[in-house]
A protein has these predicted regions:
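Bacterial N-terminal signal peptides
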Residues: 4-16
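Low-complexity, acidic/polar, glycine-enriched regions of mature
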Residues: 18-190
Length: 190
């Protein structure tokens, strides 16, 4: 009897102290907004690209978050493009000259520090691995409630060249992808 009670107490304590919550891949995603530049940028297209966040955890009390995105699942959404053009953009994006998602199939983030920044908000610093290169990044995170689940929202910018990616350029550089990308993350826990 005492042994059973001790087991139940230790199990309850371990559950109470376990704060790491898994990310829900069905509801968590990254959306990348790609803009254009160049003399004839009016002839180019803006792109919206998205992928689910494949796995990860959030530990709010410890100020820790880590997640992985399968770069091969990044998909061009662009509703203004026909299917053929969307497939072309998708192929270029995954090619060795841009993401090289065959060689670098994972995009990873691992936090190193989180500082409270108001009610349900934090400034989070961590390491982002993209295109085989890891660099420190700092982001502002806001928490929202969604259908009884916690959703952590991030909007940030990064430069492709910081991660060894050369922005796509056509027509002698008169139409090109901007180096700076806008990234929106929605990290929803289970």
């Amino acid at each position: 009897m005492w042994l059973r009670l001790l087991f139940i107490c230790s199990l309850a304590c371990s559950i109470a102290f376990a704060q790491s919550v898994p990310i829900d891949p069905a509801l968590s995603k990254i959306t990348i907004h790609v803009d254009k530049t160049g003399l004839f940028s009016f002839a180019g297209d803006k792109h919206e690209i998205a992928a689910p966040i494949a796995s990860g955890t959030v530990d709010e009390k410890a100020g820790a978050v880590e997640f992985t995105i399968d770069a091969r699942k990044l998909k061009v959404l662009d509703p203004q493009l026909d299917e053929k053009k969307r497939a072309e953009v998708q192929k270029t994006m995954h090619s060795p000259s841009v993401l090289d998602s065959t060689q670098y199939p994972e995009i990873k983030f691992h936090s190193t520090k989180a500082t409270p920044a108001g009610s349900n908000a934090w400034n989070v610093t961590g390491n982002l691995t993209l295109h085989g290169q890891t660099h420190p990044v700092s982001v502002a995170v806001k928490k929202e409630a969604r259908s009884g689940k916690a959703a952590y929202i991030v909007s940030t910018k990064l430069k492709q060249t910081d991660f060894g990616i050369t922005p796509v350029a056509v027509a002698g550089g008169t139409v090109k992808v901007k180096d700076e990308l806008k990234l929106d993350f929605e990290v929803v826990t289970r």
